[in-house]
Amino acid sequence: MATPETRRRPNILVTGSPGTGKSTLGQQVAEKLGFVFIEVSKEVRENNLQGDFDEQYNCHVLDEDKLLDHISDRLDSDEGGIVVDYHGCDLFPERWFDVVVVLRCPTEKLYDRLQSRGYSEFKIKENVECEIFGTLLEEARESYSEDIVHELQSETTEQMEENLERICELAGEFKNEHTMEQ
């Protein structure tokens, strides 16, 4: 079982409310660093890792145990180099991630993005409230060591480019620190 001390490359979690740019940024980070990208929603759909259908949210409920079993070998590897995109973080073991990025977005912009995706008013309201209260940032800070949690703004193209560079810097810092220790 890998730990940050034994991993050669960092595992990175990109989290935030739906519509903050997690998938876009996660994929860009993985491509730029030559890492593997795991888009949890896609893994769930393609590997039947969901439970019952939730009528209120108009989606299937994630079977967390199935998901964790499905991805654990990759995230427990000493090689590292995995970027995971998911809108939550408290279900993942703390040992899996070396960098946790929480994307934030102004609520007006988030509302527009979710509306353009066809989200119901109920789902939009839930996600906007989550963003207003900083629920996912708080969850990340409670689930992981605060020194690996990074809050980044994700409203503009320029911010997305800056976020890509910042995450690549963090990955480089991890690699440098762990190369010196070994």
UniProtKB/Swiss-Prot annotation:
It catalyses: AMP + ATP = 2 ADP; ATP + H2O = ADP + phosphate + H(+). Disruption phenotype: Suppresses worm growth. It is found in: Cytoplasm; Nucleus. This is Adenylate kinase isoenzyme 6 homolog. Residues 1-20 are annotated as: Disordered. One of its GO terms (cellular component) is cytoplasm. Residues 116-126 are annotated as: LID.
